Design a protein with these regions (language model features):
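Tandem CBS (Bateman) regulatory domains
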Residues: 1-12, 50-86, 90-100, 111, ...
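OB-fold/S1-family RNA-binding modules
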Residues: 29
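Cytosolic beta-strand hydrophobic patch enriched in CBS
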Residues: 16-18, 35-49, 85-86, 104-119
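A short, glycine/Asx- and small/polar-enriched loop/turn
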Residues: 176-182
């Protein structure tokens, strides 16, 4: 899936400019109940500013606390190492950036470095819920030996017994083992009958 499918376009995003004062940024963050706000000016992305960053600077670095909110500007406090990504990049790449940089969002820009919008953790999380069908069908968790043909065999059993496979995920156990956990979301009139057929085929239900 491409980033452009999940991104939030700039038209629906509240931003601040590098020259805005800290009070304006903080007021927006509080009013809109946001974690952070993109810093943008004339379609160029500069970074982000968050409540945490504002307070951190105030308590640890600010030389004049009395005039901080009014006189200090966003570019003094903003985070500048926010990753950027192209709209036609894969969502998996974007997800890796979000985890690696520990940022609430990544900026989406075009080849001319023009700001197009943002992609958030929430957007990716919600898409995963939809793709995995977590609100649909029933969950079947199967322990299978890590040998060729197991997935095909399991799929055939489910299909031949009236099951409609919504999603199919093989979970990596993160340790060296000869078995894998396969989680299947199934829609069926007789789910219990499918479970019994899976057991009869030698699979273990977890």
């Amino acid at each position: 899936m491409f980033v452009k499918s999940l991104m939030m376009g700039k038209e629906s995003i509240i931003t601040v400019s590098p020259k805005d004062n800290i009070r304006k940024a903080l007021d927006i963050i509080k009013k809109e109940n946001l974690l952070s706000v993109p810093v943008v000016y004339e379609d160029k992305f500069y970074g982000s500013i968050s409540k945490d960053k504002i307070y951190e600077y105030y308590f640890e670095e600010c030389p004049n606390k009395e005039s901080y909110l009014e006189d200090f500007i966003v570019e003094k406090v903003m985070k500048t190492d926010v990753p950027e990504i192209f709209p036609m990049s894969q969502v998996e790449e974007a997800a890796n950036y979000l985890v690696t940089y520990r940022t609430p969002f990544i900026a989406v820009v075009d080849r001319d470095d023009k700001f197009l919008g943002i992609l958030t953790h929430k957007a990716i999380f919600n898409e995963n819920i939809d793709v995995l069908g977590l609100n649909k069908g029933k969950r079947l968790s199967v322990i299978a030996y890590d040998i060729k043909g197991q997935i095909s065999k399991l799929s055939k059993i489910i299909s031949e017994n009236g099951g409609d496979i919504i999603s199919f995920v093989v979970i990596d156990p993160k340790v060296k083992t000869d078995v894998k956990e396969i989680v299947v979301r199934v829609r069926a009139n007789d789910f219990d009958a499918i479970v019994e057929k899976v057991k009869e085929a030698g699979f273990r239900i977890s």
